[in-house]
Curated annotation (Swiss-Prot):
Protein name from the UniProt record: UPF0102 protein Abu_0255
HAMAP family per the UniProt record, alphabetical: UPF0102 (MF_00048)
One function term, GO molecular function aspect: nucleic acid binding
PANTHER family for the chain: UPF0102 PROTEIN YRAN
Family as reported in the entry's similarity comment: Belongs to the UPF0102 family.
Organism whose genome encodes this protein: Aliarcobacter butzleri (strain RM4018)
Family annotation (Pfam families): UPF0102 (PF02021)
Top-rank lineage group of the source organism: Bacteria
């Protein structure tokens, strides 16, 4: 996916989250060599660390969520929590963007 397509998907995801009563805390948090968290949001005192995936079809987008990617996200989340000295409840989520369809998958696991 091109950077431009990725940026468009992230903007759609942010709009979706805001309409769903999420507060956007941070975008594109880079955790040194660990990786990037696309969106950090909060709703009902729970932090949501969100990976945005976009593709021409749903199956391709879902298949791009690998155990390696989830492991990097988890390490990035741990780094963010430690760096900011937070004691929080959180969820690792994915937003799938295919054209104008957006789906939030909450609390994904490996």
């Amino acid at each position: 996916m091109s950077k431009e397509k990725g940026d468009i998907a992230e903007k759609k995801a942010i709009s979706f989250l805001e309409k769903s009563n999420f507060e956007i805390v941070e975008k594109n948090f880079y955790a040194k060599k660990l990786g990037e968290i696309d969106i950090i949001a909060q709703r009902n005192k729970i932090y949501h660390f969100i990976e945005v995936k976009s593709a021409n079809d749903y199956e391709t987008a879902i298949n791009n969520i690998t155990s390696q990617k989830l492991s990097k996200i988890k390490r990035s989340v741990d780094f963010y929590i430690q760096k900011n000295n937070l004691n929080i409840s959180y969820s690792i989520d994915v937003i799938i963007v295919v054209d104008d369809k957006i789906e939030l998958l909450e609390n994904i696991t490996m």
